[in-house]
Amino acid sequence: MQAGQASDRYTIAVPREFFAEWLGEKLAAFRNQTPGVQYVLTADEHADFTEANLDLAVRLAEGPGDLEGVALTAPLRVTVAAHGASDAWIDWPGAPLPEGAEAAITAASPGQALASALAGMGRTVVPLALAEGALAAGRLVALGEPEPARRAYWLVAPPPQWRSKKVRALVAYLSA
């Protein structure tokens, strides 16, 4: 455990949109089952673990890379749009637009692309885990079936953090 880390406090770097759509609810449930747990959240999932004093990070990636990790979501993507949205495409780094399609909007992240689609600005391809809530609520429609993707949301950490008792407990809970 690094200086400044406590056995009941988790410092987690997580994309805002993934926290809002998937992780937040699960962290709340873990905290309810584990009295005294505290969270420190940061948005820079690619932050240096030592400099940011991180326990864990959530990354949209093909795998854990040189870190230890577990996939939190299946590697699936889906094309979505709001009811009555234009046919314009919303792009973001890593979004596989159809051949010949040109982006009318370029977003910086899948979360911005999802927000743009929810606003009726067009259609986009996003990780299924981000869109599931909006699809279930009827705020978005799927324009086709989910399809395999190269990337999923991974919970990662360097080996020393990954082996710690507190991290193992949260990893076990989130991957159950």
Task: Locate each region found by the language model.
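Conserved strand-to-helix beginnings and helix N-cap segments that scaffold or border functional pockets
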Residues: L23-G24, L128, V167-R168
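A late-sequence structural motif
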Residues: P146-A176
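Alpha-helical linker/hinge and terminal dimerization helices associated
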Residues: M1-Q5
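C-terminal regulatory
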Residues: G63-A152
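Central regulatory/effector-binding core of bacterial HTH transcription factors
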Residues: S7-P64
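Short hydrophobic/aromatic beta-strand micro-patches
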Residues: A13, V125, V156-P158
